[in-house]
């Protein structure tokens, strides 16, 4: 099976689960990124950093261009449930946000120090200053300013990451991806730590998948 086909199948398994179990999260998925936008992203990376768009990220963006949080009336006051944050690593970044982080201050050199990676996932929507990257060696974590070497991948690929997410959702154990476990609230898939939850008012409505 080709890497692209593996990614497509892994993504479909996760999104099919969302469609059946977390329809508000499923509604958060944005359409695929247009070809000209992908070409522009690849060209920017090559111009400023000397490497092109990672093949898996190109393939993912051809399936989904990121997410847009949906309006949830019960969530209006506190706004603590982001319908698009359905992965344990947060939201899928679109090209503009991903390259905005990777090309930060590129006119003065690469603040990341040169790794051929691009961020694609973050829980830090206000920044982002942390998240997951993807490169030829796989998927790992990054954070500013001290963890930008990007040389210790946790998964061999985005597809492997998505496979692990799907296994956690369908088979468990619930903490297979870390202390945050999958749960459902107001039609959304949200990962939280039952021992130290970030959810506040929404917590009483959040129910673990397992």
Please identify what each model-predicted range represents:
Residues 42-47:
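Alpha-helical scaffold elements that line and support the substrate/ligand-binding pocket
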Residues 53-56:
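Conserved hydrophobic ligand-interaction patch in extracellular adhesion modules
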Residues 1-41, 63-210:
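A C-terminal-region feature
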